[in-house]
């Protein structure tokens, strides 16, 4: 693959308000990173061929059945609740700049209470990556912990390789129960590998600032250095959308 000029995760951006056409009633003080234009000498970004967006590929993404129709189009069609408009605005800007985000390994840390659409929007981003012809994989922390403990060494190695090398990895529901010995070491190694190789990660968590007290500082530094932090506030929306798939 031809060489791709990359941009720094933290050094080469400024923040300023950006208004996205078609999104209304968004606070004007919302800010997001605006990245310098990367110099690309090929038609690929991290191995993603941008001319392959129309291809229909059957890939194993790990997306739970409950979320399998959570494309961005479907999410917008059913309506964005008022309490979610601010984080949705930031996420829509991330999607608008998706090739750049993947190019520099920029991810998202989605924080907030249960039922506030964190997982739904993470899956919507995954579908956008797949639409570019890229690879994406979803795994909940509960399933990851279970897999690390229960599968054979060969199966575990295969899973770890997949988690390391997909273009976008979604780690869902990072919580208190995973700050334990061997699992914590595995998670830290995974985060370190993807940080060093500029691979994007989206993490959802119900933890707020408590996360800083639960995970080793080195790992948290890497998450924050390569992620935009997006806070979701408000009551659970699951009852409101009970006729739809779960938030």
Indicate residue ranges for each PLM-predicted region:
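Walker A/P-loop nucleotide-binding motif
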Residues: 100-122
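Conserved catalytic network of the ASCE P-loop NTPase/AAA+ motor domain
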Residues: 100-102, 129-131, 161-164, 192-197, ...
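Short glycine-rich substrate-engagement loop in P-loop NTPases that contacts/grips substrate
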Residues: 84-89, 111, 126-165, 178-181
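Interdomain "pre-motor" coupling segment immediately N-terminal to P-loop NTPase/helicase cores
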Residues: 20-64
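Loop/turn-to-beta-strand initiation segments
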Residues: 134-135, 165-168, 197-203
């Amino acid at each position: 693959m031809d060489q791709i000029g990359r941009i720094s995760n933290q050094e080469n951006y400024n923040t300023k308000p950006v208004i996205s056409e078609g999104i209304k009633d968004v606070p004007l003080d919302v800010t997001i990173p605006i990245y310098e234009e990367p110099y690309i000498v090929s038609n690929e970004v991290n191995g993603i061929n941008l001319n392959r967006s129309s291809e229909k590929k059957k890939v194993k993404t790990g997306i739970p059945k409950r979320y399998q129709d959570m494309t961005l189009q479907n999410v917008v069609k059913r309506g964005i609740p008022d309490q979610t408009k601010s984080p949705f605005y930031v996420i829509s800007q991330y999607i608008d700049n998706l090739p750049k985000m993947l190019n520099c390994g920029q991810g998202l840390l989605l924080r907030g209470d249960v039922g506030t659409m964190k997982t739904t929007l993470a899956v919507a981003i995954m579908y956008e990556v797949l639409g570019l012809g890229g690879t994406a994989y979803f795994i909940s922390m509960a399933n990851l912990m279970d897999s690390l403990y229960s599968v054979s060494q060969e199966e575990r190695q295969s899973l770890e390789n997949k988690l390391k090398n997909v273009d976008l990895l979604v780690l869902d529901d990072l919580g208190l129960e995973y700050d334990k010995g061997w699992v914590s070491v595995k998670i830290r190694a995974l985060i370190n590998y993807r940080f060093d190789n500029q691979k994007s990660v989206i993490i959802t968590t119900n933890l707020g600032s408590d996360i800083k007290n639960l995970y080793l500082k080195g790992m948290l530094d890497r998450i924050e250095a390569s992620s935009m932090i997006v806070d979701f506030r408000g009551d659970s929306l699951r009852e409101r959308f009970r006729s739809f798939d779960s938030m």
